[in-house]
């Protein structure tokens, strides 16, 4: 019987990253979604590595996702930052982000800070709002952990209770209050994409308790919790979901609307980092 071969990509990535940035241990890993890459421009002593040089990292096919890993210091905190992510709809399945997340764990990260652009299911939460995620509903097909378990990273069965860490979320609320803008909390609904949701699907998501909807987040959050990385996640609302507004949905509109919340988003993240520094 042949021996099962698990992915060694995270181990290879560690060796490659260490050649670019030796003796560097990041505390926080960021995933920056559509139109949100500007934060990485503020990283000091930055070193950038193309995903193409990192085995298992998702070479994105989506406009607005740069496809590079940036390492350095932000507000005095050592960080690693993904400018762009992979999505289920790009054809690599639910594990498209798993090697990257496990690389962060091996690098020494304690926390995954996940961002994304999302649609609002709540009429009072419009474009330009920020929503701190407190839980999720997964409508994608399965999870990244389907298949044989890689015991090097986590147990076969694991809990998603407090997957979106409550203490870190409270810290985000404190920062938002100090910065002077509202930070709503909500439940994220994952959607496979790449088509946008139908109005009927949106009504269903509202009924089952969803507040925001998007095409990412859940695969990386599940991968992170499997290897015991804490998670905090914030969605930038770029549109009202289908059926809740007359605006025609498009990716170009998503990128343009992400600009509405960009400065608040940067202030939120920088304030958060100052508090944990």
Curated annotation (Swiss-Prot):
Rapidly inactivated by p-chloromercuriphenylsulfonic acid (p-CMB). Dithiothreitol incubation restores the activity. Induction: By xanthosine and to a lesser extent by deoxyinosine. Full expression requires XapR-xanthosine DNA-binding transcriptional activator. The half-life at 45 degrees Celsius between pH 5 and 8 is 5 to 9 minutes. One of its GO terms (cellular component) is cytoplasm. The lineage of its organism: Bacteria, Pseudomonadati, Pseudomonadota, Gammaproteobacteria, Enterobacterales. Signal peptide: none annotated. GO terms for molecular function: guanosine phosphorylase activity; identical protein binding; inosine nucleosidase activity; purine-nucleoside phosphorylase activity. This is Purine nucleoside phosphorylase 2. Optimum pH is 6.5-7.5 with guanosine as substrate. At pH higher than 7.5, there is a marked reduction in reaction rate and a steep drop at pH higher than 9. Below pH 6.5, there is a dramatic decrease in activity reaching virtually zero at pH 6.0. With xanthosine as substrate, the pH optimum is 5.8-7.2. In the reverse reaction with guanine or xanthine as substrates, the pH optimum is 6.5-8.0. The pH dependence of inosine cleavage does not vary between pH 6 and 8. Maximal activity with inosine as substrate is observed at pH 6.6. Pathway: Purine metabolism; xanthosine degradation; Purine metabolism; purine nucleoside salvage. InterPro entries: Nucleoside_phosphorylase_d, Nucleoside_phosphorylase_sf, Purine_phosphorylase, Purine_phosphorylase-2_CS, Xanthosine_phosphorylase. The keyword Transport does not apply. The purine nucleoside phosphorylases catalyze the phosphorolytic breakdown of the N-glycosidic bond in the beta-(deoxy)ribonucleoside molecules, with the formation of the corresponding free purine bases and pentose-1-phosphate. This protein can degrade all purine nucleosides including xanthosine, inosine and guanosine, but cannot cleave adenosine, deoxyadenosine or hypoxanthine arabinoside. Has a preference for the neutral over the monoanionic form of xanthosine. GO terms for biological process: deoxyguanosine catabolic process; deoxyinosine catabolic process; guanosine catabolic process; inosine catabolic process; NAD biosynthetic process via the salvage pathway; nucleobase-containing small molecule interconversion; nucleobase-containing small molecule metabolic process; protein hexamerization. Hexamer. Dimer of trimers. It is an enzyme of class 2 (transferase). Its EC number is 2.4.2.1. It comes from Escherichia coli (strain K12). Keywords: Glycosyltransferase, Transferase. A purine D-ribonucleoside binds at residues 197, 239. NCBIfam families: PNPH-PUNA-XAPA, PRK08202.1, XAPA. Changing residue 239 to D: Catalyzes the phosphorolysis of adenosine with moderate efficiency, and essentially has lost all activity against the 6-oxo-purine substrates xanthosine, inosine and guanosine. It catalyses: a purine D-ribonucleoside + phosphate = a purine nucleobase + alpha-D-ribose 1-phosphate. Phosphate binds at residues 65, 85-87, 117, 216. Disruption phenotype: Does not grow on xanthosine. Slightly increases inosine productivity compared to wild-type (5.6 g/l of inosine versus 4.6 g/l, respectively, from 40 g/l of glucose). The keyword Transmembrane helix does not apply.
């Amino acid at each position: 019987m042949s021996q099962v071969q698990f992915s060694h990509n995270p181990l290879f990535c560690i060796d490659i990253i260490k050649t670019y940035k030796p003796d560097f241990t990041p505390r926080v890993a960021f995933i920056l979604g559509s139109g949100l890459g500007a934060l990485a421009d503020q990283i000091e002593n930055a070193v950038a590595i193309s995903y193409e040089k990192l085995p298992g990292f998702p070479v994105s096919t989506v406009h607005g996702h740069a496809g590079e890993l940036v390492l350095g210091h932000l507000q005095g905190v050592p960080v690693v930052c993904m400018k762009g992510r992979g999505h289920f709809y790009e054809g690599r399945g639910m594990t498209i982000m798993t090697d990257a997340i496990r690389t962060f764990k091996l690098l020494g990260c304690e926390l995954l800070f996940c961002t994304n652009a999302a649609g609002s299911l709540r009429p009072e939460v419009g474009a330009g709002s920020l929503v701190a995620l407190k839980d999720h509903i997964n409508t994608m097909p399965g999870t990244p952990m389907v298949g044989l378990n890689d015991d090097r990273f986590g147990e076969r069965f694991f809990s998603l209770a407090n997957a979106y860490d409550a203490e870190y979320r409270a810290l985000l609320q404190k920062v938002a209050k100090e910065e002077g803008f509202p930070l709503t909390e909500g439940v994220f609904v994952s959607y496979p994409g790449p088509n946008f949701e139908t109005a009927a699907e949106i009504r269903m998501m509202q009924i089952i308790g969803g507040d925001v909807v998007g095409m990412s987040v859940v695969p990386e959050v599940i991968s992170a919790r499997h290897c015991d990385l804490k998670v905090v996640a914030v969605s930038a609302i770029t549109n009202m979901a289908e059926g809740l507004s007359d605006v025609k949905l498009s990716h170009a509109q998503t990128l343009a609307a992400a600009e509405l919340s960009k400065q608040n988003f940067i202030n939120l993240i920088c304030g958060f980092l100052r508090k944990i520094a």
